[in-house]
């Protein structure tokens, strides 16, 4: 199975399945001498882990990360960092009824078409459980970016169903179970989630992630444009069906005179481009959005077939998120951090001696 690695100089390779013994990853390219402990990684893992609120899956995994290699006496050595998280709350019996049935909207059908077999227990490798290791690896990148470059990466929920959320207060994001930055909409989200749980249904969501303090010059045209790599990273997250950079699809309705980010001696006057021009960071905030589909793991009966081609009706049992977008916030932050870390190392490798007299803001 290919496709388990992302990055060129900062490389993250993950392994493991939803109901296997453990999840793990190898992180290559971390510079030596960076203070690093398991506690540095645990904060973001706790933000992502299941069972932390009544609105997410009640699978209770502590997600305690272990550093197996690459750190000596509290600092990175420059060698591969091995990370491991044990699975402790699997209930594989919940999935015995779907051993021969393809859940509609899931990867069951496509995995079996590709490999000739599948791990039906919680989706196996296709499960969002895999993203725990992305968050752990991303926490390393976030620490390096913050301490060495002053880069801050933040994410939040900006829409659930037909409820749009304004970014009014970043400090509020960590104070409610929805990662919601809009104090006026929390009650509406709560009401929607309670209704969905009662109906046994689910809902889609939009997540926004923002990086501040990113220097100008990151990105490798033409095929490794910074926005292309960000889109690739975010699209690789489970349930993501669309990614926008900056104003995204809204630019369709704009004229060139409206969309261009004009520049004065005081800097850029707008940021429709989301901080990236020509595939290279401009020094402005990098802004990306991603749309997540409603999970298909619901108790509303649906039609499908089994592996023998027979039509059946099924209800998905188990412990699932009514809105997968909620726990996707720290995952999006991690993936953006991984991409920025990789591009910073690539920029330093090729263009460390480049100096310009062009203004920077």
UniProtKB/Swiss-Prot annotation:
Its cofactor is FMNH2. It catalyses: 5-O-(1-carboxyvinyl)-3-phosphoshikimate = chorismate + phosphate. NADP(+) binds at residues 48, 54. It comes from the Bacteria. InterPro entries: Chorismate_synth, Chorismate_synth_AroC_sf, Chorismate_synthase_CS. FMN binds at residues 125-127, 238-239, 278, 293-297, 319. Keywords: Amino-acid biosynthesis, Aromatic amino acid biosynthesis, FAD, Flavoprotein, FMN, Lyase, NADP. This is Chorismate synthase. One of its GO terms (cellular component) is cytosol. It is an enzyme of class 4 (lyase). Pfam families: Chorismate_synt. Its EC number is 4.2.3.5. It comes from Escherichia coli (strain 55989 / EAEC). GO terms for biological process: amino acid biosynthetic process; aromatic amino acid family biosynthetic process; chorismate biosynthetic process. Signal peptide: none annotated. Reduced FMN (FMNH(2)). Pathway: Metabolic intermediate biosynthesis; chorismate biosynthesis; chorismate from D-erythrose 4-phosphate and phosphoenolpyruvate: step 7/7. GO terms for molecular function: chorismate synthase activity; FMN binding. Transmembrane segments: none annotated.
């Amino acid at each position: 199975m290919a496709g388990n690695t992302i990055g060129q100089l900062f490389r993250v390779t993950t392994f493991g399945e939803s109901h296997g013994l453990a999840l793990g990853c190898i992180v290559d390219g971390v510079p030596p001498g960076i203070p690093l402990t398991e506690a540095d990684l645990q904060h973001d893992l706790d933000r992502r882990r299941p069972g932390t609120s009544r609105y997410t899956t009640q699978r209770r995994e502590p997600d305690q990360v272990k550093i197996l290699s690459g750190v000596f006496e509290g600092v990175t050595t420059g060698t591969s960092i091995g990370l491991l998280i044990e699975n402790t709350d699997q209930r594989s019996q919940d999935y015995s009824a779907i051993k021969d049935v393809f859940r509609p909207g899931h990867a069951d059908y496509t995995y079996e078409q590709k490999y000739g077999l599948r791990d039906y227990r919680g989706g196996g490798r296709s499960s969002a459980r895999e993203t725990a290791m992305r968050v752990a690896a991303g926490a390393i990148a976030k620490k390096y970016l913050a301490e060495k470059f002053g880069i801050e990466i933040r994410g939040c929920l900006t829409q659930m169903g037909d409820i749009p959320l304004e970014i009014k207060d970043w400090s509020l994001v960590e104070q409610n179970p929805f990662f919601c930055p809009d104090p006026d909409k929390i009650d509406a989200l709560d009401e929607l989630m309670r209704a969905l749980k009662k109906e046994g249904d689910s809902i889609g969501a939009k997540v926004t992630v923002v990086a501040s303090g990113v220097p100008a010059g990151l990105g490798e045209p033409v095929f490794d444009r910074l926005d292309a790599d960000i889109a690739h990273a975010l699209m690789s997250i489970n349930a993501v069906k669309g990614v926008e950079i900056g104003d995204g699809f809204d630019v369709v309705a704009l004229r060139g005179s409206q969309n261009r980010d004009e520049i004065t001696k005081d800097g850029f006057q707008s940021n429709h481009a989301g901080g990236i021009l020509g595939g290279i960071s401009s020094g402005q905030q990098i802004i990306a959005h991603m749309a997540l589909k409603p999970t298909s793991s619901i108790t509303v009966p649906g039609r499908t077939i089994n592996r023998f081609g027979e039509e059946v009706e099924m209800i998905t049992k188990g412990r699932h998120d009514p809105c997968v977008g909620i726990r996707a916030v720290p995952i999006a932050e991690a993936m953006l951090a991984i991409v920025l870390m990789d591009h910073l190392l690539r920029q330093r490798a090729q263009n460390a001696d480049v100096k310009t007299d062009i203004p920077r803001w």
